[in-house]
């Protein structure tokens, strides 16, 4: 895509062929699906797969993470939500937790420790093999999303755990990610399609996607260092497009 004051926006492919706006919309149907649908030009199928505006919207996502996001000082307390509320909508969290050689829950309404819940979560986590202290963790405790998957936590032995609160009780699963990988950074995703659980990077700056069934897939890209690089992922029901950059550009 080229833009100039004199000629406006022009669109070309790798061979130099120029396309009109309407043609370009059809080349990227999952990106311009609303425009195509409004003009009755959205196909019924793409690559043999049925598509509707709802299906496309459900599969589209954008993920962005900068080095600043990773390098920021981490809070001592992390809010935790109820992943299975009584009502259909997620509720604002009323509790937070801190981790030391155990996990401790604090009721944010009166700043008191919930000893019963703290003991229960701590017991279950340790029964599942969790070794404190926590090396790193990632969660997104906001009700402005469709669902909640709690936290991905990396324990002291580089094992990756999935921890969330369901009906006030602990949900703790070891994901099976090999400790030998030395996972150093995790980012929970919670995309609308509910296919993935998070993105992980190891000690060698390899990038992985962790699916909801805890299967792990290494992405075939160059090294990605979360401490110095920026990462942008745009995905749809067919493909992921990744862009890795730094202070000097892409």
Protein language model annotation of sequence segments:
Residues 9-13, 100-116, 157-164, 204-211, ...:
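Structural motif
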């Amino acid at each position: 895509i080229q833009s100039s004051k004199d000629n406006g926006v022009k669109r070309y492919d790798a061979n130099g062929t120029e396309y009109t706006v309407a043609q370009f919309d059809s080349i990227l149907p999952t990106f311009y699906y609303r425009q195509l649908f409004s003009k009755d030009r959205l196909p019924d199928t793409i690559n043999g797969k049925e598509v509707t505006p709802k299906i496309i919207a459900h599969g589209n996502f954008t993920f962005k993470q900068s080095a600043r996001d990773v390098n920021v000082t981490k809070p001592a307390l992390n809010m935790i939500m109820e992943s299975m509320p009584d009502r259909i909508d997620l509720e604002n969290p009323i509790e937070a937790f801190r981790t030391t050689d155990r996990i401790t829950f604090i009721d944010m309404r009166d700043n008191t420790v919930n000893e019963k819940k703290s003991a229960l979560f701590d017991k279950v986590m340790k029964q599942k093999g969790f070794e404190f202290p926590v090396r790193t963790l990632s969660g997104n405790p906001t009700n402005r999303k469709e669902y909640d998957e709690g936290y991905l936590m990396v324990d002291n032995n580089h094992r990756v755990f999935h921890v969330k609160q369901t009906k006030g009780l602990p949900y703790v699963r070891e994901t099976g990610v090999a400790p030998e990988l030395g996972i150093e950074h995790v980012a929970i995703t919670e995309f609308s399609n509910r296919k993935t659980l998070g993105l992980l990077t190891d000690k060698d700056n390899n990038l992985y996607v962790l699916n909801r069934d805890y299967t792990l897939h290494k992405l075939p890209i160059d090294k990605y260092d979360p401490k110095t690089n920026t990462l942008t992922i745009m995905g749809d029901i067919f493909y992921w497009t990744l862009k890795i950059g730094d202070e000097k550009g892409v």
